[in-house]
Amino acid sequence: MLADLVNRSQPLARDARVLVLGGGYSGGHVTRLIRALGTTVRCSRRSLSSPGADLVFDSTAGLIPTSSDLDGITHVLSTIPPTAEGHDPVLTHLGSQLKKRSLTWVGYLSTTGVYGDQQGRWVSEDDPANPGQPRSQRR
């Protein structure tokens, strides 16, 4: 499957350096695809002993990437969900550092849960948000 995705994907610029914040299920797959495309990528996990971890980001434990961890980053993808209180840990802890950088692209990987129960119907970004679950409402 990864090889098929690589064959169908557009490579990023040669000088691209991607930071994936949250290397769990989805973030881990994205990280592997970016690496397979030959692009430099750094992936955060809650622990360096986690598979695919290049740096640690665990805001609940006070483990925040340093400014030097962000050096050279051109693209950022966050998959980290908001806290139970609705705060985005990435914006809270890294927002000011990221704003100072010349980023080419910043993205947030959310959930289809923000569209609510669509009874199996396809949804897109053009559909109105209608989250039913508290977790989806925070996203």
List the predicted regions and their residue ranges.
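NAD(P)-cofactor binding segment of oxidoreductase domains
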Residues: 71-108
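Hydrophobic, well-ordered beta-alpha structural blocks that scaffold small-molecule cofactor pockets
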Residues: 1-60, 66-67, 78-79
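Short glycine-/acidic-enriched loop or helix-start segments at secondary-structure transitions
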Residues: 30, 53, 86-90, 94, ...
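Catalytic helix-loop patch of NAD(P)-dependent Rossmann-fold dehydrogenases
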Residues: 119-139
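Active-site regions of enzymes building and remodeling cell-envelope glycoconjugates
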Residues: 51-62, 93, 120-125
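SDR active-site strand-loop-helix element
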Residues: 44, 106-112
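Catalytic nucleophile serine of serine hydrolases
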Residues: 24, 110-111, 133
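Active-site loop signature of alpha/beta-hydrolase-fold enzymes
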Residues: 49, 112-115
